[in-house]
């Protein structure tokens, strides 16, 4: 969104967040940051799967979060902001609203709906995204899913709502909120 301060360019050339400063250099991109933290700091009870189906699911969900689930959410956020912001002559507003609706209904809405159905079907038979315990894949997936639940867009998806409640009930999640503070999901 180009809203990050210029000071981030001193940390990473893109000047965007998130970015993590490590002894080996800066790491940008959420998935890479999560994977780095898991590999370097995770305990036995919170680690990356190393083989089999759990590894396949870990890799899939780790990248699905930002590669498939976040793009329609971000596009929706940006288009809705464009609809609401800025001074528009009264006769232009219906045209911009129709344009935004057309973009959302033709592409982003159907893709988001398809992704939500897929996530819902997976969570209907799995507690976590990659194995019997939470992993970095869950760290990646929680933000878009809790954003959807908070916005009311996941009201018809009981398994997604249950998953978000499970994550929110975890002591580690509560500790993270205590350290980082509450946030509004978008």
Per-region residue spans from a language model:
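GST-like domain detector, emphasizing the conserved glutathione-binding G-site
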Residues: 1-102
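Phosphate-coordinating loops and pocket residues in cytosolic domains that bind phosphorylated ligands
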Residues: 10, 169, 178-179
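Conserved hydrophobic "DFG−1" position in protein kinase catalytic cores
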Residues: 21-22, 130, 141, 185
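Residue-level recognition of oxygen-bearing side chains
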Residues: 32, 159, 172
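GST-like fold's C-terminal all-alpha helical module
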Residues: 62-169
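Terminal-tail/helix-coil boundary detector
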Residues: 173-186
């Amino acid at each position: 969104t180009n809203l990050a301060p210029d000071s981030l360019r001193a940390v990473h050339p893109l000047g965007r967040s998130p970015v993590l400063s490590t002894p080996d250099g800066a790491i940008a991109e959420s998935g890479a940051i999560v994977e780095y933290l898991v590999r370097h700091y995770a305990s036995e009870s919170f680690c990356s799967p190393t083989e089999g189906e759990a590894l396949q699911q870990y890799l899939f969900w780790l990248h699905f979060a930002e590669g498939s689930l976040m793009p329609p959410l971000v596009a929706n956020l940006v288009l809705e902001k464009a609809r609401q912001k800025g001074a528009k002559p009264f006769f232009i507003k219906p045209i911009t609203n129709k344009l935004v609706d057309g973009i959302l209904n033709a592409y982003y809405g159907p893709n988001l709906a398809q992704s939500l159905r897929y996530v819902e079907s997976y969570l209907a038979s799995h507690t976590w995204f990659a194995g019997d315990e939470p992993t970095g894949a869950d760290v990646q997936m929680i933000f878009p899913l809790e954003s959807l639940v908070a916005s009311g867009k996941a009201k018809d998806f009981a398994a997604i709502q249950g998953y978000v409640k499970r994550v929110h009930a975890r002591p580690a999640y509560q500790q993270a909120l205590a350290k980082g503070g509450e946030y509004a999901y978008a």
